[in-house]
């Protein structure tokens, strides 16, 4: 082992060790706090994602979880990242599904989910028991198609009479 022999050397060593331990502890705490904040921002939907060739789930209701589960088990979508955009406080589903908090039709929410680079999207009705939800679904579809005209888009239809409107909005 190497250690200082003289009194002066020992004083310098102690004076160096104490701040060194403090700096190392501060560095570790800063890194840990940053990682925790990063994870919390993801759970609260406050992150911006840089994605390409991903699946967007716009809106959330009780059918959304089943649809995501189906996509997760379909070999065509197995490697494709999934990003949920919904006006909820926290993520409705665990990772590896990504979450963006906000109105599904807003430019900010679509931009933070890299909607312009999405390969496919599905829009869920805000209230599956209210036929008026089709109007909001059509607006979301229009907003997405404006950003990404090539996206393959499906939407939940409540009232069959509104089918033409959703097709006109770009739903496949």
Regions from the language model: what does each represent?
Residues 3-4, 8-13, 17, 21-172:
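Cytosolic regulatory regions of ion transport systems
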């Amino acid at each position: 082992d190497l250690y200082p022999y003289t009194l002066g050397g020992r004083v310098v060593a102690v004076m160096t060790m104490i701040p060194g331990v403090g700096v190392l502890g501060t560095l570790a705490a800063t890194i840990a706090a940053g990682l925790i904040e990063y994870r919390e921002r993801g759970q609260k939907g406050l992150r911006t994602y840089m994605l390409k060739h991903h699946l967007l789930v716009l809106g959330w209701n009780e059918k959304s979880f089943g649809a995501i589960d189906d996509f997760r088990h379909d070999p065509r979508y197995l490697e494709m990242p999934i990003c949920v955009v919904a006006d909820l406080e926290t993520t409705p589903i665990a990772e590896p599904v990504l979450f963006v908090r906000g109105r599904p039709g807003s430019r900010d929410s679509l931009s933070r989910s890299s909607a312009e680079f999405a390969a496919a999207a599905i829009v869920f009705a805000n209230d599956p028991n209210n036929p008026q939800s089709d109007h909001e679904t059509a607006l979301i579809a229009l907003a997405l198609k404006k950003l990404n005209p090539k996206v393959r888009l499906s939407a939940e239809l409540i009232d069959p009479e509104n089918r033409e409107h959703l097709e006109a909005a770009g739903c496949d």
